[in-house]
Amino acid sequence: MRLTRITRVVLAIGLLISLTSVAKAAETPPSEQESIGGTPPRLSFTKGEVSFWRPGAQDWSQAQVNTPLAPGDQLYTGPQGDLELQIGSRAFVRCWANTQLGLENHEPDFLQFKVTSGYASFDLRTVEPGRTVEVDTPNAAFTIEHPGYYRVDVSAERTSFTTRRAGQATVIPAGGEAVIVEPSEEVVISGTENPQVTSYAAPQLDAWDKWNYARTDHLLDAVSARYVSPGVYGVDDLDLYGTWRSVPTYGTVWVPRGVPAGWAPYTTGSWMLDPYYGWTWVDTAPWGWAPYHYGRWVSVNGFWAWAPGPVVVRPAYSP
């Protein structure tokens, strides 16, 4: 009985904070809401050693899936590490081993990353008109405004940047002039002072490129996409970890599989202080993004279900 009461208290607190956050967001003037992108980049996948650092932290900590990134955040993959960020409903950033990636800026139409070392891919199946993704390295900056597959490899004295699938970008070497990177092209920037820029035909896809292609194809083939708004992140996880049901009052809802008896929302995770959104729920379940940032949880015949709400063009993100 006591455990049941504790669960109810925790759930009530979680739902209260969530509803307060939604109300606060609704009261915020549009100019303030639009000063940062509507949905933060989501850490959607990790494998092996992946570390996270936020400005003000004493040290690096283990990265947690479903963490929303804020400007200034840093991620690092160890020798056997991999990570994935979702930055759009059809756009992903992935890092291979020994890579440091930072989020420098996040605005409605501008997303800026910095790759200090290692290997990063930007698989952008869609880029909204007017939106720019910038990738900074120690000796050059790359701007992307078109869908495509982009890969950047960074070492101490050399950066290579490759475009594929009709991708096109602009490179500005440190202290140099802008150069267009055409589709299926590789540019290599050598040196940090007065860097030299050379261009080649894009090399053949390697094993990591092929893995990136296949993973994105898989993520975009989610059945759950039929039931949620197109801008919702983490839809593929709903296929793997739950089922959809039609119930009176709420219509089509999603029910998680494999949760223990007596489980309730807001009991498997923690609140993180986001520098822009304030207190934000970070759930430890791999599926714990969409059900906590869109729609609402409802109790149906003794079990909890997520009601995504009506399908809209631009769903509102809630911390």
Language-model-derived ranges and their functions:
Residues 1-11:
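Bacterial N-terminal signal peptides that target proteins for export
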Residues 8, 41, 46, 63, ...:
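Functionally constrained cores in energy, signaling, and assembly domains
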Residues 10-20:
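Bacterial N-terminal signal peptides
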Residues 188-319:
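Low-complexity segments
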